């Protein structure tokens, strides 16, 4: 839900899945080699995956440093907020010995060991291991209604157990493909808190620009304490390349 209420939008066709190589861990322990970004809608998401997503999202809310919401969301609230439009989920897979170009289209069935299966995305993802294979996820929705609905907004989550592996950057790269594929011409992030350095660096690296700053936009938790402090937020924008 945006500040403008529910924004009507025609659903788009499900887009192809895309693959990205994970950076190699320095300790040599790596059970997954790639992340497959999969376009989904509410009915495509099996219960175990939804629960893993909601758990990760609520852990992020409890941290109190990146999203404005104070309290964890129950199932209905999470579905309403996250699944109203389009969702992209990063699925961790082991594709060692195979060569893929980052961002290329792939068969989800083959990467999940189902061969040339014609099963639905819901059924395929139901065979994966959650939360072990959850690399991250994000929603994409219109930021404004009507005459400005060509500009979208997205919200990204990387599970705490998967941070530091560069997954946020891979999700961001996929967003540059999926955003215009969903029919949007540009993206805006309304609240990138100054303390969220990882996010700001990702968007700068991907060619986004800071177009505004909101003073004292968030009353955020101070890490390692019970205190809170006001933090400014950046407004970050990018026009998508033509799809």
What are these regions (language model features)?
Residues 5-23, 190-192, 204-227, 231-235:
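Conserved catalytic-core motifs of GNAT/GCN5-like acyltransferases
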Residues 179-194, 198-201:
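Conserved GNAT acetyl-CoA-binding A-motif
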Residues 65-163, 172-173, 178, 239-241:
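Acetyl-CoA-dependent GNAT
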Residues 56-59, 178, 202, 206:
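Alpha-helical interaction/dimerization surfaces of two-component signaling modules
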Residues 170-187, 209:
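Conserved acyl-CoA
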Residues 166:
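Glycine-rich phosphate-binding loop
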């Amino acid at each position: 839900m945006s500040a403008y209420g529910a924004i009507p939008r025609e659903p788009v066709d499900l887009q192809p899945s895309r693959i990205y190589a994970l950076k190699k861990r320095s300790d040599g322990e790596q059970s997954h080699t790639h992340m497959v970004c999969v376009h989904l809608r509410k009915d495509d998401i099996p219960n175990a995956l939804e629960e893993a997503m909601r758990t990760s999202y609520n852990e992020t809310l409890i941290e109190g440093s990146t999203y404005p919401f104070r309290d964890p969301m129950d199932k209905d609230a999470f579905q309403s907020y996250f699944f109203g439009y389009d969702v992209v989920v990063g699925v961790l897979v082991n594709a060692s010995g195979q060569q893929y170009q980052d961002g290329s289209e792939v068969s989800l069935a083959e990467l999940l060991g189902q061969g040339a299966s014609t099963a639905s995305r819901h059924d395929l993802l139901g065979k994966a291991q959650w939360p072990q294979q959850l690399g991250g996820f994000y929603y994409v929705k219109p930021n404004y209604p009507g005459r400005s609905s060509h500009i979208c907004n997205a919200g990204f989550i990387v599970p705490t157990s998967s941070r530091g592996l560069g997954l946020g950057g891979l999700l961001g790269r996929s967003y540059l493909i999926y955003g215009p594929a969903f029919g949007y011409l540009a993206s805006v992030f309304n609240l990138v808190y100054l303390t969220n350095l990882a996010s700001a660096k990702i968007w700068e690296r991907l060619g986004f620009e800071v177009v505004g700053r909101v003073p004292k936009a968030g009353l955020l938790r101070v890490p390692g304490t019970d205190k809170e402090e006001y933090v400014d937020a950046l407004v970050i924008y990018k026009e998508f390349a033509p799809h």
